[in-house]
């Protein structure tokens, strides 16, 4: 039986799940927990409610309905996305192979305004350790982050590179890192280099020489996961076509991560379209 894995349990993710499971496709939703909807005190502009509804209540009803129809929800954090013979979402609870994946984790967090971070993207700044570790064999690199997502990237790099430095950029550690990883808690003032990364400048002016910086801030949102497969991204928005498919076959995105109007109604529509089109594509084989 074909299966779809959806990353995110907000309006877009649950809507996609409803349409996919009703189309006869085995559907699993991976969720780290409540998102932006749960922080909404009241919603007054959503179809079908005579009185304002709170975000948590709307979320509860939606998930309850999806479970009733057979959608499986798994509480875990997605940390990677790969494709060998099929798409696979890597999580803290294990790997979830899928015939199609829908990314619906909401809008990406703002990337810190570190000079050189975006300018050297693809020239020493990377968003995917599994994709690019090979190019840094025997070299000194850094991972920018402090949590489980950063740990996942560190573990992919350690067998390949000479050394890994963890740059927390002032944030507290929220994961246990291997002892061979050098942890630097200072703020990063700049990523250095002209043609390619040569190092980082830390608060106070100290410079650490490096050949690459891997970005793994916070949790792996939809944009970060899309980048891991080379899907087109414009700023913090995942590029999709009129069927909500990214530039990678079988990979879809819906909701705030695609940009535009950041509203529940828009997220529900895009989720419905992504779930419908993904299921339709699987039926065609």
Stretches found by the model and what they are:
Residues 15, 19-20, 101, 156, ...:
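Hydrophobic/aromatic ligand-binding patch that stacks against planar heteroaromatic rings
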Residues 39-40, 113-118, 134-136, 173-180:
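Short loop/helix-cap segments at secondary-structure boundaries that form the rim of catalytic
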Residues 66, 102, 125-128, 157, ...:
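Hydrophobic structural packing positions in well-ordered secondary structure
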Residues 39, 280-285:
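Active-site-proximal substrate-binding core of FAD-dependent oxidoreductases
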Residues 1-5, 73-138, 214-216, 238-246:
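FAD-binding core/adjacent interface of flavoenzyme oxidoreductases
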Residues 113, 119-135, 217-266, 273-276, ...:
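FAD-site-proximal beta/loop scaffold in flavoenzymes
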Residues 4-60, 65, 139-173:
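Beta1-alpha1 glycine-rich phosphate/pyrophosphate-binding loop at the start
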Residues 66-84, 88-90, 96-98, 159-238, ...:
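A Rossmann-like FAD-binding core segment of flavoenzymes
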């Amino acid at each position: 039986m074909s299966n779809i894995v959806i990353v995110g349990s907000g309006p877009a993710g649950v809507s996609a799940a409803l349409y996919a499971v009703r189309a006869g496709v085995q559907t699993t939703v991976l969720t780290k927990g409540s998102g932006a909807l749960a922080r909404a005190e009241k919603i007054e502009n959503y179809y079908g409610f005579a009185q304002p509804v709170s975000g948590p209540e709307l979320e509860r009803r939606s998930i309850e309905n999806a479970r009733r129809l057979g959608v499986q929800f798994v509480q875990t954090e997605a940390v990677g996305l790969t494709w060998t013979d099929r798409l696979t979402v890597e999580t803290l609870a294990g790997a979830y192979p899928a015939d199609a994946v829908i990314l619906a984790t909401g809008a990406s967090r703002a990337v810190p305004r570190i000079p050189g971070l975006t300018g050297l993207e693809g020239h020493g700044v990377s968003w995917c350790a599994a994709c690019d570790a090979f190019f840094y064999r025997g070299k000194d690199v850094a991972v920018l982050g402090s949590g489980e997502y950063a740990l996942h990237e560190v573990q992919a790099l350690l067998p390949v590179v000479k050394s890994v430095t963890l740059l927390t950029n002032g944030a507290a550690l929220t994961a246990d890192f291997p002892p061979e990883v050098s942890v630097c808690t200072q703020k990063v003032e700049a990523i250095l280099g002209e043609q390619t990364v040569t190092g980082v400048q830390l608060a106070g002016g100290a410079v650490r020489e490096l050949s690459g910086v891997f970005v793994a801030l916070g949790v792996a949102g939809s944009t970060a996961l899309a980048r891991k497969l080379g899907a087109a991204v414009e700023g913090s928005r995942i590029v999709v076509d009129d069927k909500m498919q990214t530039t990678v076959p079988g990979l879809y995105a819906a909701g705030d991560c695609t940009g535009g109007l950041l509203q529940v109604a828009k997220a529900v529509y895009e989720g419905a379209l992504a779930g419908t089109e993904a299921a339709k594509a699987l039926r065609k084989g």
